[in-house]
Regions:
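Active-site gating/metal-coordination segments in enzymes
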Residues: 1-64, 112-115, 120-125
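Acidic (Asp/Glu)-rich catalytic clusters
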Residues: 15-26, 80, 84, 109-111, ...
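Generic enzyme active-site microenvironment
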Residues: 28, 32, 66, 95, ...
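Conserved, mostly hydrophobic/aromatic
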Residues: 28-30, 58, 109, 134, ...
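Mid-to-C-terminal alpha-helical segments outside catalytic/metal-binding sites
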Residues: 57, 164-195
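Glycine- and Gly-Pro-enriched alpha-helical subdomains that act as flexible
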Residues: 64-84
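Active-site core of metal-dependent hydrolases
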Residues: 79-126
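Short acidic/histidine-rich active-site segments
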Residues: 140-162, 184
Length: 195
């Protein structure tokens, strides 16, 4: 997680590389950038450095990535643009976890091959951009998420989140798109298996 990179050492990267090669590992993440809690160019530089190295590890072991990006839209998209430009052969780069940016940015991520992770926030009253995003991107590029234990959907907002809450996310996506919840469930399950 980006919040933890300040303490990372080279030995940690070596251990991560070793663990990532285990058969049970299906993706590398959460990796990315988080400028919400700490400010400053030095801290941003450290995050960017480790993010790029973790992307390279995922490429090396041929695993998708789970991207965390909070208050770091421009830096995240630029790093991923550069990564995809150098690695166009990667068919399934990963998911932008707990997506919270604009529909336009989501479309660019989708064009790069990423899935867009939609969680409990889509049920919140103030989630206008996310609702627009869900309406505008292909259902074939959406994954449903919990972000457990955080961001529990309405009507249970503020409580501990878990996988039993995913139904509310599916129902909201179906409502936004004007389709049956079963269609959302079927397609997003196929998406998750494909990723």
């Amino acid at each position: 997680h980006p919040d933890e990179v300040e303490a990372m050492k080279e030995a940690d990267m070596e251990e991560l590389s070793h663990m990532a090669k285990e058969d049970k590992v299906v993706a590398i993440g959460e990796i990315g950038l988080d400028y919400f809690r700490k400010e400053g160019n030095a801290y941003k530089g450290i995050q960017k450095e480790w993010f790029c190295r973790q992307l390279d590890l995922a490429k090396e072991i041929e695993k998708p990535v789970i991207i965390h990006s909070r208050d770091a839209a421009e830096d995240t998209i630029q790093i991923l643009r550069d990564f995809r430009k150098k690695n166009p052969q990667i068919e399934n780069p990963g998911v932008i976890h707990c997506y919270s940016y604009s529909p336009e940015l989501a479309k660019e991520y989708v064009a790069m091959g990423f899935y867009i992770g939609i969680g409990g926030v889509v049920t919140f009253k103030n989630a206008k951009k996310l609702v627009e995003t869900v309406a505008q991107i292909p259902l074939e590029r959406i994954l449903v998420e919990t972000d457990s234990p955080y961001l529990c959907p309405e009507p249970n907002r503020g409580k501990r989140n878990d996988s039993s809450q995913i139904r509310y996310v599916i129902d909201r996506i179906a409502d936004i798109r004007g389709i049956a919840p079963e269609e959302v469930e079927k397609q997003t399950e196929m998406n998750a298996r494909k990723m």
